[in-house]
Amino acid sequence: MEQGKHLAGLILAVFLLQGTMAHVKEVKVDDNREDGSVILICVTNDTTITWLKDVEQIGSGDTKKNTWNLGSSTKDPRGIYKCEGSNNQSKSLQIYYRMCQNCIELNPSTVAGFIFTEIVSIFLLAVGVYFIAGQEGVRQSRASDKQTLLNNDQLYQPLKEREDDQYSHLRKN
């Protein structure tokens, strides 16, 4: 019973690996050039090669060298590239150059995120201003709020004779 499981596992492994062992062309990248250009190299023995970018044919390259020049790396040659021979089998290679480390790619979801964040921040700022402005501040005193300290609008209160009251404690002779 134990040998039957191992045999079934071996047959399954051979069957599944059959597709990966088939000869599939590879695409390599050469971007260490002095002029800054990016060159794709198709590793195959076919003489006729068709180059594809994002499933669209971009042309036939140099069949002697099996290469395709993408141009300068500063022009951002991004995409999924394939080289196909006569049997139309190829591995795809995704190329993505990001020249700016601090740049933001403006796709629709990024723009929507910026707009949503802006609306939320303006709303929160408006709510904050509303609550701060709505608070009661220091009230202005009214005439009815004043306490009468001296009767009949007296400006000064006369001191009693020979009594200095509180001023006598400040100065000592």
Curated annotation (Swiss-Prot):
Q: Where is this motif: Di-leucine motif?
A: 149-150
Instruction: Answer yes or no on keyword Phosphoprotein.
Output: yes
- Please give, as recorded in its UniProt entry, the membrane topology of this protein: Single-pass type I membrane protein
Keyword list, A-Z = Adaptive immunity, Cell membrane, Disulfide bond, Glycoprotein, Immunity, Immunoglobulin domain, Membrane, Phosphoprotein, Receptor, Signal, Transmembrane, Transmembrane helix
Domain (Ig-like) spans 24-94
* InterPro entries membership: CD3_esu/gsu/dsu, Ig-like_dom_sf, Ig-like_fold, Ig_4, Ig_sub2, Phos_immunorcpt_sig_ITAM
Disulfides per UniProt: C42-C83
UniProt's post-translational modification comment states: Phosphorylated on Tyr residues after T-cell receptor triggering by LCK in association with CD4/CD8. Phosphorylated also by PKC; leading to the TCR complex down-regulation.
Query: Which residues point to the Extracellular side?
Result: 23-111
Residues annotated as domain ITAM: 145-173
Q: Where are the bilayer-spanning segments? A: 112-132
**Compartments it resides in:** Cell membrane
Could you state a single Gene Ontology molecular function term?
transmembrane signaling receptor activity
Please explain the role this protein plays, according to its UniProt record: Part of the TCR-CD3 complex present on T-lymphocyte cell surface that plays an essential role in adaptive immune response. When antigen presenting cells (APCs) activate T-cell receptor (TCR), TCR-mediated signals are transmitted across the cell membrane by the CD3 chains CD3D, CD3E, CD3G and CD3Z. All CD3 chains contain immunoreceptor tyrosine-based activation motifs (ITAMs) in their cytoplasmic domain. Upon TCR engagement, these motifs become phosphorylated by Src family protein tyrosine kinases LCK and FYN, resulting in the activation of downstream signaling pathways.
Assembly and interactions? The TCR-CD3 complex is composed of a CD3D/CD3E and a CD3G/CD3E heterodimers that preferentially associate with TCRalpha and TCRbeta, respectively, to form TCRalpha/CD3E/CD3G and TCRbeta/CD3G/CD3E trimers. In turn, the hexamer interacts with CD3Z homodimer to form the TCR-CD3 complex. Alternatively, TCRalpha and TCRbeta can be replaced by TCRgamma and TCRdelta.
UniProt remark on domains: A di-leucine motif and a tyrosine-based motif are individually sufficient to induce both endocytosis and delivery to lysosomes.
**The protein's name:** T-cell surface glycoprotein CD3 gamma chain
Per the UniProt record, the source organism is: Bos taurus
Lineage of origin: Eukaryota, Metazoa, Chordata, Craniata, Vertebrata
Gene from which this protein is expressed: CD3G
